Swiss-Prot record:
Pfam family of the protein (one): Ribosomal_L9_N
Ranges that cross the membrane: none
UniProt-recorded name of the protein: Large ribosomal subunit protein bL9
BP-aspect Gene Ontology terms: translation
GO molecular function: rRNA binding; structural constituent of ribosome
Lineage: Bacteria, Bacillati, Actinomycetota, Actinomycetes, Micrococcales
Length: 150
């Protein structure tokens, strides 16, 4: 097991500044190369304190911005135009990247596709819902209107 310091939020592990213990391969092959974590060192304690101080300063501003974004997201129906067959079944399915792109196109704001959660695969036209994790303590429900392209 390896001790690492998270530099970004990682779903299921923790947020930036947390010290977590993960399997060696996960740390060596994924977290460190992707920039999500750095190896724990003796100077790591100072790094953790600096990361946490920076996060606390951003926390106030980001919570206010997240609440504004939540209000916008929940007040708007996001329209997705996708290829579909005659009976309304999609060719493929709607992905989180498609939802993020549609939200951006609607002028609501930019979302990270990794923070969007679809309860189940969207494979038909109609109204669907998705959850967006905006902050550690705040999430928003988006109404997606999936329509067939002409």
């Amino acid at each position: 097991m390896s001790k690492v310091i998270l530099t970004h939020e990682v779903t299921g592990l923790g947020s930036a500044g947390d010290v977590v213990e993960v399997k060696d391969g996960y740390a060596r092959n994924y977290l460190v190369p992707q920039g999500f974590a750095i190896s724990w060192t003796r100077g790591g304690k100072k790094q953790v304190e600096q990361i946490k101080a920076a996060r606390a300063a951003r926390e106030l501003h980001s919570m206010e911005a997240a609440q504004e974004l939540k209000a916008k997201l929940e007040a708007t129906r996001v329209k997705l135009v996708v290829k579909a067959g005659r009976e309304g079944r999609l060719f493929g399915s709607v992905k989180t990247a498609d939802v993020a792109e549609a939200v951006k196109a609607a002028g609501i704001g930019e979302l990270d596709k990794r923070k969007i959660e679809l309860p189940n695969a969207i494979k038909a036209v109609g109204d669907h819902e998705a959850t967006v994790r905006l902050h550690e303590d705040l999430s928003a429900m988006i109404t997606l209107q999936v329509v067939a392209a002409n």
